[in-house]
């Protein structure tokens, strides 16, 4: 009628409870380790993403001024931009910078093929050091430390030259030129550094070039 409870029975129940408790502790420890590792991975990933985002915003150039050069057909044959580092930017290597050129008739990505030929001078791979249909030219205005091609000081100034006459061609090369950018035409330039920082410039050609002579500079 009554169950007899012995000391042996109570001991077996105690051991079972202890085993379950130890197993729960081990599972909790493993789970905690996984959570710590996951949190560390997520933190590192977030830091990398944040650094990349900052670079895209800060590591870029600033365009100080622009002008065009009048061609022989009352158009703009060349565009020149004076650039420097944007505020807060780290060094920008113009040799690893690209420019997307977009007009009403043409779209092309330009790279810098300028090579140094001395401490503070440069010549372009193209004829007579002039940019062509897929390259932009680069020349020094000021460069305190002689590191031509790399903007690494707020005092550095370079001129970027884009040959619009070569780009706006009928056959995609430097033959059969049909002129540069016409009066009133608009062109968009996106200057992108190696880290992804982008500066956009939208330029509109003068509405009229009457009285302007060939090779005369005009403000854009």
UniProtKB/Swiss-Prot annotation:
Source organism phylogeny: Archaea, Methanobacteriati, Methanobacteriota, Stenosarchaea group, Halobacteria
Keywords: Archaeal flagellum, Glycoprotein
Compartment list: Archaeal flagellum
Listed Pfam families: Arch_flagellin
Species for this entry: Haloferax volcanii (strain ATCC 29605 / DSM 3757 / JCM 8879 / NBRC 14742 / NCIMB 2012 / VKM B-1768 / DS2) (Halobacterium volcanii)
Record note on disruption phenotype: Straight flagella, mainly at the poles. Cells lacking flgA2 but not flgA1 are hypermotile, display an increased number of flagella per cell, as well as an increased flagellum length. Cells lacking both flgA1 and flgA2 show defects in motility, whitout affecting surface adhesion ability.
Glycosylation sites (chain numbering): 78, 95, 112, 124
Coiled-coil regions listed in the entry: none
GO biological process: archaeal or bacterial-type flagellum-dependent cell motility
Post-translational modification: Glycosylated by a pentasaccharide similar to the S-layer glycoprotein, probably comprising a hexose, 2 hexuronic acids, a methyl ester of a hexuronic acid and mannose.
Prosequence residues removed at maturation: 1-11
UniProt-recorded name of the protein: Flagellin A2
UniProt family annotation: Belongs to the archaeal flagellin family.
InterPro entries, A to Z: Flagellin/pilin_N_arc, Flagellin_arc
This protein's record includes keyword Glycoprotein: yes
